[in-house]
From Swiss-Prot:
Coiled coil: none annotated. The gene is RSR1. One of its GO terms (cellular component) is incipient cellular bud site. The modification Cysteine methyl ester is found at residue 245. It is found in: Cell membrane. This is Ras-related protein RSR1. It comes from Candida albicans (Yeast). It is a lipid-anchor. Its main location: membrane. Belongs to the small GTPase superfamily. Ras family. It catalyses: GTP + H2O = GDP + phosphate + H(+). CDD domains: RSR1. Keywords: Cell membrane, GTP-binding, Hydrolase, Lipoprotein, Membrane, Methylation, Nucleotide-binding, Prenylation. One of its GO terms (biological process) is positive regulation of Rho protein signal transduction.
Length: 248
């Protein structure tokens, strides 16, 4: 079973705790109590794989922003939540997303954009199109309008971010495997080149040895011929025509 840490981010009062508790416990929490930090765990199955989720429900108020960076560092996936009844809550997400990308030092971070409180149609100030536009501006980040009260798209939003985490891990694993195979091939090629070089050196050594032996034989024969010639010069032909040849 794989462990995944999901961080829920957003302005205060947008319903981060409500959708988290609804997802984990199946209960709607109506009262608003500003959260410092709550941690929840839930085991789910995504695409046939068992996952143990740790969900961090973070504070939305300004005095807890220092803690937020720690949550972002440890998180693998993020739900960025705004309220469709609060235009400023969507604007705050722009800065939050930039903070996530900066801390994670990546443009490829598992992330879902969530427009909560879609059941409050009479209080709505942000349309679905507003959320879609932000999603497009962020590179087609998955976007869901949710209702914590009616559990509309709550499970879908969490499962989506988990699925993104799984895909990213699979891609990283495949890349590492490919790099390992490439290194193995390079090592084999280097070993083959080294072996070929040694064979060439051995052949070159044998050729030099053979040439040296030939040179030594030729030098020996030259020396014998020189001695023979000297001996003939030292003992000229006799009057009877006999030859005296002394080979030393």
């Amino acid at each position: 079973m794989r462990d995944y840490k999901v961080v829920v981010l957003g302005a205060g009062g947008v319903g981060k705790s409500s959708i988290t508790v609804q997802f984990v416990q199946g209960v709607y929490v109506e009262s608003y109590d500003p959260t410092i930090e709550d941690s929840y765990r839930k085991q789910i199955e995504v695409d046939g794989r068992a996952c143990d989720l740790e969900i961090l429900d973070t504070a939305g108020v300004a005095q807890f922003t220092a803690m937020r960076e720690l949550y972002i560092k440890s998180g693998k996936g993020f739900l960025l939540v705004y309220s469709v009844t609060d235009e400023n809550s969507l604007k705050e997400l722009l800065a939050l997303r930039e903070q996530v990308l900066r801390i994670k030092d990546s443009d490829n971070v598992p992330m879902v954009l969530v427009g909560n409180k879609c059941d409050l149609e009479d209080d709505r100030v942000l349309s679905i199109e507003d959320g879609v536009k932000v999603s497009q501006d962020w590179g087609l980040v998955p976007f869901y309008e949710t209702s914590a009260m009616y559990k509309t798209n709550v499970d879908e939003a969490f499962i989506d971010v988990v699925r993104q985490i799984m895909r990213k891990e699979a891609a990283i694993s495949a890349e590492k495997k490919q790099q390992k195979e490439l290194q193995k091939q390079q090592q084999q090629q280097q070993q083959e080149q080294d072996a070929e070089g040694q064979q060439q050196q051995q052949k070159s050594g044998k050729s030099k040895s053979s040439a040296t032996q030939k040179d030594a034989t030729a030098d020996g024969q030259t020396d014998v011929n020189a001695r023979l010639k000297q001996s003939i010069n030292d003992h000229p032909k006799s009057s009877s025509g006999s030859k005296f040849c002394t080979i030393i």
